Amino acid sequence: MATAMAASAAERAVLEEEFRWLLHAEVHAVLRQLQDILKEASLRFTLPGPSTEGPAKQENFILGSCGTDQVKGVLTLQGDALSQADVNLKMPRNNQLLHFAFREDKQWKLQQIQDARNHVSQAIYLLANRDESYQFKTGAEVLKLMDAVMLQLTRARNRLTTPATLTLPEIAASGLTRMFAPTLPSDLLVNVYINLNKLCLTVYQLHTLQPTSTKNFRPAGGAVLHSPGAMFEWGSQRLEVSHVHKVECVIPWLNDALVYFTVSLQLCQQLKDKISVFSSYWSSRPF
């Protein structure tokens, strides 16, 4: 019995020593690694910061789709904003070619990119507040920090992977519709959004439902991408989507950022798991 107790005490002493090393050394090593990764992620957003001068660089992306050649164009991305959009639309019925582009005095902010970058900056701020001189006293303190960092990283990732669901009236009311010259025809709606590592542009062609129409009018709810047949009211008119054209382009640095988010979340979870291993030995006391 005495031997077993001595062995248990010795084992506990070893575990306590390992845990102190984890708190005082390995935790800070992981925090440094996380900061380095997230700084790289932040740089991928190519926005001007305190250490950079001038506007963000412009990048041109050709829109394409394997399913349609009705829409072609080029989008110019500058940091978190579309600084130019040059779009050609071939009308399905008569093959008439429509061309429209952003007015030169206009830019369209991509809120998804801006929000994702802000969440990354917040995660970096949380990590920087626990520099090498800070002494973690409990595992619970580390878990709390990891949870806070993971929350910001999850929100950053979700902003890029989960586009907003919008109703057709919300798209119609969007300022994006008024960005173009010449002015978009009243039977066209345009939406732009980020989905994973892609910048997507959707053009909706509409037709008016006549008061004598026998169709059962059912307004469509919110969606990332509406289908032909979706209906909505706008002003005094009832409208229906007749054609949907979606084109997209891959943004390489968004893919990089998503990879950095995934790696960072894995590092956070691994550190949490190591802390939790010790908790099973100290279930009756704070760890």
Swiss-Prot record:
Compartments, record wording: Nucleus envelope; Presynapse; Cell projection, Axon; Perikaryon
InterPro entries according to UniProt: RAVE2/Rogdi
One GO biological process term: amelogenesis
Protein name in UniProt: Protein rogdi homolog
Tissue specificity note: Detected at synapses in the stratum lucidum in the hippocampus CA3 region (at protein level).
Residue positions where N-acetylalanine is found in the record: A2
Record family assignment: Belongs to the rogdi family.
Species annotation: Rattus norvegicus
